[in-house]
Structures are given as structure tokens and as C-alpha cells.
Amino acid sequence: MSTSSSDPFFNFTKSSFRSAAAQKASATSLPPLPGPDKKVPGMDIKYDVVIVGSGPIGCTYARELVEAGYKVAMFDIGEIDSGLKIGAHKKNTVEYQKNIDKFVNVIQGQLMSVSVPVNTLVIDTLSPTSWQASSFFVRNGSNPEQDPLRNLSGQAVTRVVGGMSTHWTCATPRFDREQRPLLVKDDQDADDAEWDRLYTKAESYFKTGTDQFKESIRHNLVLNKLAEEYKGQRDFQQIPLAATRRSPTFVEWSSANTVFDLQNRPNTDAPNERFNLFPAVACERVVRNTSNSEIESLHIHDLISGDRFEIKADVFVLTAGAVHNAQLLVNSGFGQLGRPDPANPPQLLPSLGSYITEQSLVFCQTVMSTELIDSVKSDMIIRGNPGDLGYSVTYTPGAETNKHPDWWNEKVKNHMMQHQEDPLPIPFEDPEPQVTTLFQPSHPWHTQIHRDAFSYGAVQQSIDSRLIVDWRFFGRTEPKEENKLWFSDKITDTYNMPQPTFDFRFPAGRTSKEAEDMMTDMCVMSAKIGGFLPGSLPQFMEPGLVLHLGGTHRMGFDEQEDKCCVNTDSRVFGFKNLFLGGCGNIPTAYGANPTLTAMSLAIKSCEYIKNNFTPSPFTDQAE
């Protein structure tokens, strides 16, 4: 923490000091829930199922189990900030769909960095009367134990009800065989069938489709050009998207709310269902029984009142994300608190936080070529000049010589006539491109060729965004034991939980070679659409910026042989009633967006729960 050997903090990280959070990591001394006359509104003495986290995976568990008759409570550290529909996508507003670049600020405002190395910059211009630290500060996300050379510097979390689904891209591709974990051993056909069954159901929950942008001029412009350039070599299609087109100018993007309406139940629409959502509640630990065979309760901290309670349930499901699932487990006595010590492995879940993966990411932006833009109006018959009295734009509907369908030509004609001041023939409200060539063994990376909002890549107002195409290629990373996520026994995060720390490097060999090949592929492909936008030349982005962290609590068939934490039903090994959901379960090297796969695993997990746990009887009394 300090660079000076004379400073009292110089050897702090090697000291025997343990933070208050670390000292309480296995504490079980919380008071019981308050009685029915004093309980938090909606909070019951005992639930059938408790779910931690309200993102799409938590909502998958909620939907499956609430509809099956279970009494379910869901706790989330974040608050409701998405409007009338709890956990809805914030891009579902006309303002952002008219100007996607404005949504970048929404994303940036939602993301909280996981681990930030301390800033070693010394401010030596302070007044002599001002207090000056002799060591580095530990607030504002700073982590003195984070090696900046082994960090996932772009890794961040979203703490709101609905999680990252309130601002995600909604890309929901299926994994192919190379990316998927096995669910059925020694029978590839049966495994394929099982994944197809689960994927189909997950897609129905998310409303995944591949035709929402079929009548976008820009989309077809990019799609057709790439299909022509790579004919016989690569297949191009729309990105599979969790979204529903409501009109030619408005798309409803799916989110946690799409999967499950987070309104409390019973209610008018669901009089026979039982569900309660508790926002702004930090879940601090699960309490194990004396034989380490099941979980007895969950300790929660109401962040508004400051009160702490113990929640009882038959089943406990953690879906708080790849970082916070592991954090909660470590704070409960699983894995190892503090810097990993290979000579002293933990007894419970020794692989927790090991073999983590995160995708490499290359990015650039191009400005569409003159050739492409001119081709937009290739079927138009233009007379005169814009603004002239005799100016007209027409086309011949249904003509065999037309290069574009009538819907395309009608849009172009109307725009060129109604907006003669616009030098571009593309309508102002033309939907953005959403193109991909999917992950394949010959090019093992996922591609998103589109125009969307991320925490980076906003376009200057001096450039018309209709001309811009974003290129994001995602590479897979081989799981390696030395790549770890661990939690400090000395430093705590903003919520007084053990501070997450990364020990990660992209592995040499296949992972690194594929990343270079992916960069070359993006450069060559993007040049076929146009020239690079100044300031957005091809580049590798910060590790972790993809936000697809995986493998923190890996899935497998055997805990020891597969170095994993949960089985294929997402149940923690050795515990009959503790389940983990999310991308942290995925143990493989994957390049595609993992959310649909994580949801599929959650559906399978729910099937196990329904087969092994019985819902409590429903009563007519208010629950």
C-alpha cells in the first residue's frame, strides 16, 4: 500500500490484520426475522425459495418456480430505477432510439468497476496545511492488492433491479459444440438434443428473433455487401436478438422484466402465485448446517433502514453475477478468503474463483463507402436538383431491373422528397445494422457488426451516425488454473464485503494466436464496408470490458476431476439445497454472448428443483 519502508503501512498487506467483513465471514449470530407484526412489508418468516439477484437468470428461476406454485422471495442489492416496468430495458424510450449515442451515458452511469489499482500519482501541490496520506487511498473502488498488470481493468457490475439487462445489447446467440459445456456424457446426439430443448425454451422467454431488422436499409446494405464479398466462405445473418419490433421505428428490447414480471404476488393478474421482490437489500452470507450438507438461512442487510435479518428457506439460489456469487460464497466460508495459498487449499469448493475466463475484444468504427451510399438510391429516377421547383424522385415498383425491394425504394423516395435538405438518401429513422457471422471452427470468434451503445464508441456530433458501422469481435479464452478471482481479507468494497481482486492474463498459445487472427479478420472485413473513423481505429480494448466473465464457479460432472463447483443441475457439490446461476457456471472457452446459455442452465436447474422440493400449501390469507 505504501512505497516507503519507513511508513507504518509498508507491510500492511503481509500483516495478520483481518477486516471486519473477514472476521464475520462465518458468523451466524444475526437475530431472527422480526415477528409478523413488525416484519418488512411482504417479508415472510419462511419461504420455499430465496433468490439472490434480479437479472435475467434470477428471473428465469422466479418464473419457473413461481408458476409451479413455490413461495419465492427475491433480494437485490440494487434499487428499482427503470420506470413503470420493473427491471425493464432503459433503451425502450423514443429518445434513445432516435439517438443511440445518448444511451452511452446511461450505460456509463450504471457500471461500477470491480477492482481498480491504486493511483500512484502524488499530488504535491496541495496546501501545506492539507492532510496528505503517506500511503495510497482505498476508497472509490481503489484496491491496493490489485496488480495492475494482472487485472481485468474493464470489468464492472451493475447494481440495479434487472441487472445488466437494463442496458445490454440483447444479443442471444446459441453456443455451438465447441463452446458448450456437456450436459450428457458420452452421447453427443443426446447432448445436442438436450441443449436444443433448453435453448428453445430460453429463446421463448427472451423473445429472441432474427428478423427484427429485415426492413432496415443500413442493415441490408452491410449484410448484402459482406455476403457478396465472402460468398462461399462465410455465412452472414442478423444477430439473434432478444427484442420485439413494435413499429417500423420502435423496438422493445428484452430484459429481466421480459422473462418475469417482477410485480409482487398475489395480485390481480396472478391471484394464485406467491412472490416478493426486496430491492436495496445486500445479501451477505448463507449459513451452513453443522454437517455442511445444506443451507439453513440467508443473512441480509436492509441498506435503507440499516437492519439485518436472517431469512429461512428450503432452497437458496444465488444469481448475483459471476463476481458477487463468488463473493457471497467466500464470505460464507466457501473457498478461500485472502490471497490464494496453493499450499493450503480450502476444504469447501477449492476451485471457487479459479479457471476464470473473459473474452478478448477488438473494436473499430467505419464510415460507409461512397459506393455503398450511392447504391441506396440506385433504383431512383431523379429529375432536377434538391430545392428546385421541378425536383422529383420516382422509381418503377416491381421492375425486374430494380436492385432493391419496393419497401426499400419507397422509403428512399419519400425521404429524398420530404427531406431535400439531407444529402444522405437514408431515412432518418432507418433502423441500425445488426449483422453477424457466427462463431465457427474456421473463425472461432463472435462478431457484432452493428451500431449500438456501449460504455465506449460514442460518435461525435459532427459525424452523421447513419454512416457509422461498429465492429466488435469477441475471442474465446482457454480456462487456466492460474487465472483467478479472489477476495481480500483486509480490504472491503463499497458494500463492506471482501474486495474482489483479479489475477488474470490472456494465456499464451491458442488464445493469443486467435486474438491476433481475430484482429486481422476484423480489419480486412471492415475495410470492405468503408474507411476507419478517426479516433476509432482497430484496437484491442481493456481486458474485462466485454463484461462476459465466466468460470468463477464452474460446472462439471465431478468436483475433483473437473475442478468445478456445481453439477449440471447447477447444484453446489455436497449441498442439497444451494444452487448457483449465471455465466460463472460456464466452464468452457466461449466467444459468443453467454446469457442465453446461462439461462438454459437455469431452466435445467429449475427442473431439478421442481422434481426434488415440494411447494408449501397455498392459503387464501395475504402472504
Swiss-Prot record:
Substrate binds at residues 448, 450. SUPFAM superfamilies: FAD-linked reductases, C-terminal domain, FAD/NAD(P)-binding domain. Its EC number is 1.1.3.10. Optimum temperature is about 50 degrees Celsius. Active from 30 to 65 degrees Celsius. Thermostable for 30 minutes up to 55 degrees Celsius. The keyword Lipoprotein does not apply. Binds 1 FAD covalently per subunit. Residues 28-38 form a propeptide. The keyword Oxidoreductase applies. Residues 1-27 form the signal peptide. Keywords: FAD, Flavoprotein, Oxidoreductase, Periplasm, Signal. Coiled coil: none annotated. Its main location: periplasm. Optimum pH is about 6.5. Active from pH 5 to 9. Stable from pH 3 to 11. PANTHER family: PYRANOSE 2-OXIDASE. This is Pyranose 2-oxidase.
